Amino acid sequence: MIVRSLSDILDGPTHIKSDAFESRRIITARDGVGYSLHDTLIRAGTDQRLEYKNHVESNYVIAGEGEVENLLSGEVFPLSDGTIYTLDNHEPHMIRARTDMRVVCVFTPALTGGETHDKDGSYDG
């Protein structure tokens, strides 16, 4: 059994910060469960172009408002607390945060915890 608190990882090696977001990676590859789980804060007024070429990601919005755009189809979906979206086909997408957002993210395969986005908005496989 793994029991961990958010406070256990704050300001540690799995707490990744950028101008647009903070990713607090609570469960990582070292835990051996096949996925990673992140508590992510997205800053109001930010736009992020992302494309996870090597991972499937599910995102559950628990606070805030914004939108996600599928850059292949042009479809735009509103995001607010209680909304989930999954990037099951590695879609390039744009996240726009209208307010500060808090999102629970699940990645498979699991991230090791220290990854940062490359120039394409992806992580290495």
Label for each model-derived stretch:
Residues 40, 59, 85:
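Conserved GNAT-family N-acetyltransferase fold
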Residues 89-114:
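Ligand-binding loop in jelly-roll beta-barrel domains
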Residues 43-45, 81-82, 88-90:
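Tight coil/turn sites that cap or link beta-strands
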Residues 48-50, 68-69, 87, 92-98:
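Short beta-strand His + acidic residue motifs that chelate non-heme Fe in jelly-roll/DSBH
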Residues 36-53:
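Conserved short histidine dyad/triad with adjacent acidic residue
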Residues 53, 58-81, 91:
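A short beta-strand-loop-beta hairpin characteristic of the jelly-roll/cupin
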Residues 31-32, 73, 100:
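Short strand-connecting beta-turns/loops that link adjacent beta-strands
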Residues 1-35, 49, 115-125:
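A short, N-terminal "cap"/entry segment at the start of jelly-roll beta-barrel domains
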